[in-house]
Regions:
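Hydrophobic, aromatic-rich alpha-helical transmembrane segments
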Residues: 26-30, 57, 61, 65, ...
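Small-polar-interrupted transmembrane alpha-helices in polytopic inner-membrane proteins
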Residues: 65-80, 130-143
Length: 197
């Protein structure tokens, strides 16, 4: 497992954010919801934006979804090339949710959330939803560190991967609009016909 430059800073930041050993009750429940379940609220928000959106907004959402898949693929590659232990594997700090002992850098949860958050923010007509997604992404990122399954640098890496993935996919927007968006529109129409017939 890799030891990052500035590892002492990474661990110091982690210990400053990580929850105390006696965390319980509502605080623990809130942190677990933030860490593990806001991703489902984001999915519901994206579905709502897709159904209610204009065709150009759905085309952009499709592009962002492709960027998210690319981001998660990059995470797999990064994890293979530069594996880094999770806090409980060191061990350091306190851990409150179970997790497999696998590489921590970057965080898949945070990468997914930040890719959609930046993506939604990037289209002016979806920016208000983007603000909500940014709050969700920030809370999820905090929760992953607070509950002891990620280091702060894992989250920072996720934010960078999210931006890079969006930048890499953006030049392919014309191809996505021409080839993939029509298929997505047919799926969209089929969903509406099925639900509202």
């Amino acid at each position: 497992m890799l030891r990052f430059p500035f590892e002492s800073t990474n661990r110091a930041l982690f210990l400053a954010i990580n929850a105390p050993a006696d965390l319980a009750g509502g605080s623990l429940s809130f942190a677990i919801i933030a860490s593990n379940y806001l991703v489902f609220l984001l999915a519901a928000l994206l579905l709502w934006a897709w159904i209610r959106g204009q065709p150009f907004e759905r085309r952009w959402l499709l592009t962002v979804a492709i960027a998210a898949l690319l981001a998660l693929s990059l995470n797999i590659l990064i994890g293979m090339l530069v594996p880094h232990p999770r806090p409980f594997m060191v061990p350091v700090g306190n851990t409150f949710i179970p997790h497999d002992p696998e590489t921590s850098f970057p965080s898949d949860h945070a990468t997914l959330m930040w890719t959609f958050a930046w993506g939604l923010y990037g289209l002016p007509t979806l920016r208000r939803i983007g603000y909500v997604a940014i709050v969700f992404a920030a809370l999820t990122s905090w929760g992953r560190v607070f509950l002891g399954v990620h280091f702060p640098f894992d989250i920072a890496g996720s934010m960078v991967v999210a931006v890079i993935s969006l930048m890499l996919v953006r030049p392919w927007q014309p191809y996505i609009d021409a080839r993939l968006a029509p298929l997505a529109e047919r799926v969209h129409v089929g969903m509406l016909e099925k639900w509202f017939k």
